[in-house]
Design a protein with these regions (language model features):
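Short, internal acidic amphipathic alpha-helical interface segments
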Residues: 79-102
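Active-site scaffold of zinc-dependent metalloenzymes
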Residues: 41-79, 89-92
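General N-terminal targeting signals
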Residues: 32, 60-62, 84-86
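Metalloprotease/metallohydrolase-associated module, dominated by Zn2+-dependent proteases
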Residues: 2-37, 96-160
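Short, charged, low-complexity patches
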Residues: 75, 79-83, 129-133
């Protein structure tokens, strides 16, 4: 069982603040709006073909934040990937504008995007950042109200 005392304090604080703001149960859309409000710009989730080794990535543009999810994922994998990328924003792993994207707006990004460059540019997290995002994403899953896409009861009990 996962005890809140075993979590790093930054993950505890982000989870507590998020649940305090959104309530014990919330949707992915609620979480996306919460992140957008905290960062002061919209957060868009896009699906696109990505390499098999990459299920998602995120970056910050001048006027919006973007999460790119590999097209064709199962609903549960899609949710887990979205939550992982959302966790990067919540944990401040993503600056207000991603290095190299200082000139990109949503419009210019969508017109002339090179997803290989995007993936390379957004795959520079060190292992602790990835571990922290995965831990927070797993805990956020416990609060997501998405019916069949939420974590099964037996798995939820592992984290209580």
């Amino acid at each position: 069982m996962m005890d809140m005392l075993q979590l790093p304090s930054n993950i505890q604080a982000v989870l507590s603040t998020t649940v305090q703001f959104l309530g014990e149960t919330f949707t992915l859309d609620d979480l996306v709006l919460h992140i957008a409000g905290r960062r002061g710009k919209p957060l868009h989730i896009l699906e696109h073909p990505l390499d098999a080794a990459t299920t998602g990535c995120c970056l910050a543009l001048i006027d919006a934040d973007i999460i790119i999810i590999r097209a064709g994922l199962s609903p549960s994998r899609y949710l887990n990937t979205c939550l992982h990328e959302c966790a990067h924003f919540l944990l401040h792993h993503i600056p207000q504008v991603t290095a190299g994207a200082e000139q990109w707006t949503v419009e210019t990004f969508l017109e002339d995007v090179n997803f290989q460059n995007v993936r390379r540019r957004t795959s520079m997290y060190d292992k602790p950042c990835e571990d922290a995002a995965e831990s927070l994403a797993t805990l956020l899953t416990l609060h997501i109200a998405n019916g069949d896409m939420s974590m099964p009861l037996f798995a939820r009990n592992l984290y209580k």
